[in-house]
From Swiss-Prot:
<dbReference type="Pfam" id="PF00848">
    <property type="entry name" value="Ring_hydroxyl_A"/>
</dbReference>
<dbReference type="Pfam" id="PF00355">
    <property type="entry name" value="Rieske"/>
</dbReference>
<feature type="binding site">
    <location>
        <position position="234"/>
    </location>
    <ligand>
        <name>Fe cation</name>
    </ligand>
</feature>
<dbReference type="InterPro" id="IPR017941">
    <property type="entry name" value="Rieske_2Fe-2S"/>
</dbReference>
<feature type="binding site">
    <location>
        <position position="124"/>
    </location>
    <ligand>
        <name>[2Fe-2S] cluster</name>
    </ligand>
</feature>
<dbReference type="GO" id="GO:0009056">
    <property type="term" value="P:catabolic process"/>
</dbReference>
<dbReference type="InterPro" id="IPR001663">
    <property type="entry name" value="Rng_hydr_dOase-A"/>
</dbReference>
<feature type="domain" description="Rieske">
    <location>
        <begin position="59"/>
        <end position="157"/>
    </location>
</feature>
<keyword id="KW-0058">Aromatic hydrocarbons catabolism</keyword>
<keyword id="KW-0408">Iron</keyword>
<dbReference type="InterPro" id="IPR036922">
    <property type="entry name" value="Rieske_2Fe-2S_sf"/>
</dbReference>
<keyword id="KW-0560">Oxidoreductase</keyword>
<feature type="binding site">
    <location>
        <position position="121"/>
    </location>
    <ligand>
        <name>[2Fe-2S] cluster</name>
    </ligand>
</feature>
<dbReference type="GO" id="GO:0005506">
    <property type="term" value="F:iron ion binding"/>
</dbReference>
<dbReference type="InterPro" id="IPR043266">
    <property type="entry name" value="RHO_NdoB-like_C"/>
</dbReference>
<keyword id="KW-0223">Dioxygenase</keyword>
<comment type="similarity">
    <text>Belongs to the bacterial ring-hydroxylating dioxygenase alpha subunit family.</text>
</comment>
Length: 458
């Protein structure tokens, strides 16, 4: 047998000498006063703690079941900065394991996606089956002992890549490294009805239309996650003027576009998840997706069937919904773009894979969703570029010393009389409040400062 079993290896705690105490981390976010310390977006030591305490303990979106329909189909992606392989197994289940050879650490798969019977390290040829078992080591007998027969003291079963927990929710595949973390549905909790607005409109569920895209943005991952979690405010003010203008017919100008002031947002009771939407005003959805998708999503037989199926939610009154499942799963129901944010240090994030998640039918609607997503929310999309430009400029400013010396304001809604909306489940607030943002950062601070699930669990 090897020195450690796989179970022992996965249980080894990684500890580092830190300059940030748990108490100091908690002080970075004050949800009661609505204050955020800007160092959370730019500090390298905080980022290293994020990799350990957030990305190694949270349920992270990796893809859709439609990405890997057949045995041996795989997709390579990331959990934090750890490269992983997601593979469909012979029994139909899904495994996720570290994309790392246990010999010298080389990736065992260098393609983005495909179908394989095995994964072979290109450095020394160690080979692993689709379940992650080490099955072949070149010159094994010669390299590990001089016996021609018998036990060499090297057991291949000890040297498979680290395995993650895998669970799915209505087509979405999530993984988690932490054996002590709550199960996925407990983790999602009261956010599930808001996810269902996109994922559960029909009995057939959703599929993936078109390919996947990936791109890198030089900004901290939390700017992107927070915007999808809580920030309808930017869409109704300045950020998307160019995107909206490009969508208008020639006879209209921006003076004729009025964004709604009526809407709500949701803050999860636990977990940092959040969502927001306008009520009974389709202007934003029309500006992004055009009349065909807006009508399909809000009127007619498909919308009526969805409303009956999702009777917990008044879906036909919800427009322009945005959502983040903490930390990095973000999507836009009605626009139907969905993506993960993969951190690349404190100053960079990779968006992807990003894809369009669509109802199973009809075909013309799927094609219209695909076409409009290409135009608006992808690497070259008008709205995507509007968002990215703002995040990048914020990050550039945070290179300075004084830019990180004063707290940022997250006080919208703090001094406003309670505007919870009883028509929607869970804790809700006014659409232009920052209740969901305060919830996200409060949970961020808890995960960063509470290493034990006994205190952190729901």
């Amino acid at each position: 047998m090897g020195i450690y079993s796989e179970r022992e290896v996965q249980a080894v705690p990684m500890t580092f000498k830190r300059r940030w105490t748990d108490e100091a981390i908690r002080a970075l976010v004050d949800q009661d006063k609505g204050l955020i310390d800007p160092r959370i977006y730019a500090d390298q030591d905080l980022y290293e703690i994020e990799l350990e305490r957030i990305f190694a303990r949270s349920w992270l979106l990796l893809g859709h079941e439609a990405h890997i329909p057949k045995t041996g189909d795989y997709l390579t992606t990331y959990m934090g900065e750890d490269p992983v392989i997601m593979v469909r197994q012979k029994d139909g289940s899904i495994k996720v394991f570290l994309n790392q050879c246990r010999h010298r650490g080389m990736r065992i798969c260098r393609s983005d996606a495909g179908n394989a019977k095995a994964f072979t390290c290109t450095y020394h040829g160690w080979a692993y089956d689709i379940a992650g078992n080490l099955v072949n080591v070149p010159y094994e007998k010669e390299a590990f002992c001089d016996k021609k027969e018998g036990d060499c003291g090297f057991d291949k079963a000890d040297w498979g890549p680290l395995q993650a927990r895998v669970e799915t929710y209505k087509g979405l595949i999530f993984a988690n490294w932490d054996a002590e973390a709550p199960d996925l549905k407990t983790y999602l909790s009261d956010a599930m009805p808001y996810m269902d607005v996109m994922l559960d409109r029909t009995e057939a569920g959703t599929t993936v239309v078109g390919g996947m895209q990936k791109w890198v943005i030089p900004c901290n991952w939390k700017f992107a996650a927070e915007q999808f979690c809580s920030d309808m405010y930017h869409a109704g003010t300045m950020a998307h003027l160019s995107g909206v203008l490009s969508s208008l017919p020639p006879e209209m100008d921006l003076t004729q576009v009025q964004m709604s002031k009526n809407g709500s947002q949701f803050r999860a009771a636990w977990g940092g998840h959040g969502s927001g939407w306008f009520i009974n005003d389709a202007a934003i959805l029309m500006a992004v997706m055009g009349p065909k998708i807006t009508q399909y999503w809000t009127q007619g037989p498909a919308a009526e069937k969805a409303a009956k199926r999702l009777n917990q939610m008044p879906t036909q009154t919800m427009f322009g919904q945005h959502m983040t499942v903490f930390p990095t799963c973000s999507f836009l129901p009605g626009i139907n773009t969905i993506r993960s944010w993969h951190p690349r240090g404190p100053n960079e994030v990779e968006c992807g894979p990003s894809w369009s998640s669509m109802p199973m039918r009809p075909e013309d609607i799927k094609e219209e969703f695909r076409r409009q997503n290409i135009r608006t929310f992808n690497a070259g999309g008008t709205f995507e570029q509007d968002d990215g430009e703002n995040w990048v400029e914020i990050q550039r400013g945070l290179r300075g010393h004084k830019a990180k010396s004063a707290p940022l304001c997250a006080q919208m809604g703090l001094n406003v009389p309670n505007k919870s909306n009883p028509d929607f489940p869970g804790k809700t607030a006014y659409v232009y409040a920052e209740e969901a943002a305060r919830g996200m950062y409060h949970h961020w601070a808890r995960m960063m400062s509470e290493p034990n699930w006994e205190t952190l669990k729901p």
